Design a protein with these regions (language model features):
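Ankyrin repeat boundary/linker residues
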Residues: 20, 54, 87, 120, ...
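Conserved ankyrin/ankyrin-like repeat signature
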Residues: 38, 71-72, 104-105, 137-138, ...
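Ankyrin-repeat inter-repeat connecting loop/turn
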Residues: 49-50, 83, 116, 150, ...
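Membrane-associated feature with strongest affinity for ZDHHC
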Residues: 245, 249-375, 382-391, 395-449
Length: 449
């Protein structure tokens, strides 16, 4: 799989830190190293042209754009530089900007007439180059502000999500899936993005694609007849092959495999726990408290016995409460969801927002929402949960912001873990009961323990 060939001048080189020591001999080197003073001298005093390429066919505006010098780019445009000038590979300055993700330079170029959909000899657009180099913020910027086509194919039929999967940039994949990029598209080799992620052994990229995808992406074969799992196994990526094989098994058409890997995995142990509580309660009442063949229980024994029954009934009440909403985040289309604009990311100031921490994993490509901090997507419930801890099989529900305190009574490991707080928690339950339980205090206890 070929990659875009763009020469990069190191931004942390000694020459760039001290332009006076750089070998600045013409307008091209002046633009590459950001020596604005010498550039003006070459142009205004020596009469050098900014519209002609160097010996390799590269333009001054490309070098300035690559190394993120927006003031020099603006100067070049004002002095005859062509924003759409192309080199021997038909790449424009915008292609070079995408390598470094220089948003400020991209704005200068695009506001001065640069074509956002310009293609090179390989059919790469700026969105393809940004995906190849993992420039997620840059990609989102040109899509939101300049309506760049994030799903356009190159000459080999590969869209930006193919390149992001091949290079293993999971955040870029999340953004593209969040914007409804087609993850089932096959290129000329018959490969989907999942095929390329499996070939390179990128576990996180495969995980994002599988959780946001369907059975079809797991089972589709390339032109050689291989599925993503088979390609991962053939390349020696055992962890990826195992993950994809398990995902295939969960979607198996065989009724037994589908039952155990699919339905039972979703249902969990909740029916077993529910039936156990009911059966033990009935047996206790019939065999001990109301047994006709046993001596009549004393008042003290009866008090403790019915207290045990009350605890059992209370457990059923809490079991019912655990089956409720654990703190699901509202999705587009849900009742109570407010969407002020067509683009969800337009509502967020990426530089100054209590909700945004600069982590693109906050985007959920499945639920199409921007998650708050500490929220995660549950692949079993297929919902995003606020303050997600884990999916508990004993209650067949997630443990999140709302249910973290109640889950304590159904998880033996958590009960041992929180032994020092046992008396305090029981006291709080006796005083406030479940409906008025202070969730914030319980959550803090859960975290501290």
């Amino acid at each position: 799989m070929a990659s875009s060939e763009i020469e990069v001048v190191s931004s942390d080189s000694k020459a760039q830190q001290n332009p006076s020591e750089a070998p600045v001999i013409d307008v091209f080197s002046a633009c590459a190293y950001g020596d604005f003073q010498k550039l003006r001298k070459f142009v205004e005093e020596d009469g050098a042209s900014l519209s002609q390429p160097d010996l390799n066919g590269y333009y001054a505006i490309q070098w300035a754009a690559l190394n993120n010098f927006p003031d020099i780019v603006q100067y070049i445009i004002e002095h005859g530089g062509d924003v759409n000038a192309t080199d021997n590979m038909q790449q424009t300055a915008l292609h070079w900007v995408a390598v470094r993700g220089a948003i400020a330079v991209a704005d200068v170029l695009l506001q001065n007439g640069a074509r956002v959909e310009a293609v090179d000899v390989n059919g790469y657009r700026a969105v393809h180059v940004a995906a190849q180099y993992g420039q997620t913020a840059f990609l989102n910027h040109i899509v939101v502000k300049y309506q760049a086509d994030f799903d356009a194919p190159d000459n080999e039929g590969r869209s930006p999500i193919h390149w992001a999967a091949y290079k293993g940039f999971a955040d870029t994949i999340r953004l593209l899936l969040f914007r409804d990029a087609c993850q089932g598209r096959q290129d000329k080799e018959g490969c989907t993005p999942l095929h390329w992620a499996a070939i390179r052994g990128h576990v996180e990229a495969c995980t994002v694609l599988v959780h946001a995808g369907t059975k079809q992406e797991l089972m589709v074969k390339d032109n050689a007849g291989f599925t993503p799992a088979q390609l991962a196994s053939d390349k020696g990526h055992r962890h990826v092959a195992l993950f994809l094989s398990n995902a295939q098994r969960a979607h198996s058409n065989h009724w037994l495999g589908k039952f155990w890997s699919g339905k039972m995995a979703d249902i969990g142990y909740a029916p077993i726990l529910f039936c156990t509580i009911i059966i033990l309660t009935v047996l206790f009442i019939n065999s001990i408290l109301a047994a006709p063949n046993l001596p009549k229980v004393t008042a003290v024994v009866g008090l403790w016995g019915w207290a045990a029954v009350s605890v059992s009934v209370g457990s059923l009440v809490m079991f019912y409460r655990c089956s409720k909403d654990p703190g699901y985040l509202k999705r587009p289309g849900d009742v109570g969801y407010h969407k002020d604009t067509e683009d969800l990311l337009l509502n967020i100031d990426l530089n100054n927002s209590s909700m945004w921490t600069g982590n693109w994993s906050q985007l959920c490509p499945t639920c199409k929402i921007v998650r708050p901090v500490r929220s995660k997507h549950c692949p079993i419930c297929k919902r995003c949960v606020e303050q997600f801890d884990h999916h508990c099989p004993w209650i067949s529900n997630c443990v999140g912001k709302v249910r973290s305190c109640i889950n304590y009574y159904f998880c033996p490991s958590q009960k041992r873990k929180m032994k020092p707080f046992d008396g305090f928690i029981k006291f709080c339950f006796l005083i406030k009961w479940v409906d008025v339980w202070d969730k914030d205090i319980a959550s803090e206890i859960f975290i501290i323990s």
